[in-house]
Amino acid sequence: MEAIKGSDVNVPDAVFAWMLDGRGGVKPLENTDVIDEAHPCWLHLNYVHHDSAQWLATTPLLPNNVRDALAGESTRPRVSRFGEGTLITLRCINGSTDERPDQLVAMRVYMDGRLIVSTRQRKVLALDDVVSDLEEGTGPTDCGGWLVDVCDALTDHSSEFIEQLHDKIIDLEDNLLDQQIPPRGFLALLRKQLIVMRRYMAPQRDVYARLASERLPWMSDDQRRRMQDIADRLGRGLDEIDACIARTGVMADEIAQVMQENLARRTYTMSLMAMVFLPSTFLTGLFGVNLGGIPGGGWQFGFSIFCILLVVLIGGVALWLHRSKWL
């Protein structure tokens, strides 16, 4: 591969433009630098910035299809070969478990043995781990190591997010055992998060597996083995997601059953109350007809005796219901 001049890559509004020093560190890219396989360059761009968008649209260092893909709409994770270069689209978890993950953060990468061009619109928090290692001098030394470290960081964030969702499901199951129903929409959000994760992480696992199997010239055998380990780790996370989705379905049925039982219990209680007071209601209605005069209306103890009879009647009905094991 021919060397690249630093002035051809240095974009004024780039998030950062660094050269890997081959010892785990980086230095800012200068216009006089020479970019080659021994000293690759990492150019990280926000494709909505003016200078970055113009560079992506006009640079001869990228194939036409790659230029469009790096600044295009978000797609599912995939990997494509373009001659000596490779275009990779990845997804990352940025938010917390309380947010709606309708769209995961997308990061697109084009790389060969000399140049790494990554683009994004929203910040990719997982890259902070790789950036921190490079600034401390303990980061990757070449393009293959950079890609493995980035995929490892993305998988770490995904695994942490899946673990948090798993913990929330365990808490929800414990609450259901105590007949505690979650707030409205809580389970729907949880299930939405799991489904979105499953949608994007499954093809991302396939991307990792393909990168591990492809004989890319800038990846060593050790780096391919590490990439396969990352794919396997993400695969285990997907198995956990599938299990969590199944558990949320069971919990939805359990919540519906608990709510139905509560409704049935309240209806049963109201029915028993109506049964207890039904005889007294009949007697008070009968006495209140007053067609031939109220019986005992002229007796001073008539009303008191009638109230006592009602209490005895209600108590008798309640006792009968209790002995019949309805109460």
From Swiss-Prot:
- Ranges facing Cytoplasmic side: 1-273, 322-327
Where in the cell?
Cell inner membrane
Q: Which UniProt keywords apply?
A: Cell inner membrane, Cell membrane, Ion transport, Membrane, Transmembrane, Transmembrane helix, Transport, Zinc
Segments passing through the bilayer: 274-294, 301-321
What is this enzyme's catalytic activity, as reactions?
Zn(2+)(out) + H(+)(out) = Zn(2+)(in) + H(+)(in)
Periplasmic side residue ranges read 295-300
Indicate whether Membrane appears among the record's keywords. yes
What Gene3D superfamilies does the record tag this protein with?
CorA soluble domain-like (3.30.460.20), Magnesium transport protein CorA, transmembrane region (1.20.58.340)
Origin, by domain of life? Answer: Bacteria
Q: Which topology term describes how it sits in the membrane?
A: Multi-pass membrane protein
Q: Which Pfam families match?
A: CorA
Q: Which GO CC terms are listed, alphabetically?
A: plasma membrane
* GO MF term list: cobalt ion binding; cobalt ion transmembrane transporter activity; magnesium ion binding; magnesium ion transmembrane transporter activity; zinc ion transmembrane transporter activity
Which family does the entry's similarity section mention? Belongs to the CorA metal ion transporter (MIT) (TC 1.A.35) family.
Q: Which NCBIfam families match?
A: PRK09546.1
| Function noted in UniProt | Zinc transporter. Acts as a Zn(2+):proton symporter, which likely mediates zinc ion uptake.
What protein name does the entry list?
Zinc transport protein ZntB
* Organism, scientific name: Shigella flexneri
Q: What is the lineage of its organism?
A: Bacteria, Pseudomonadati, Pseudomonadota, Gammaproteobacteria, Enterobacterales
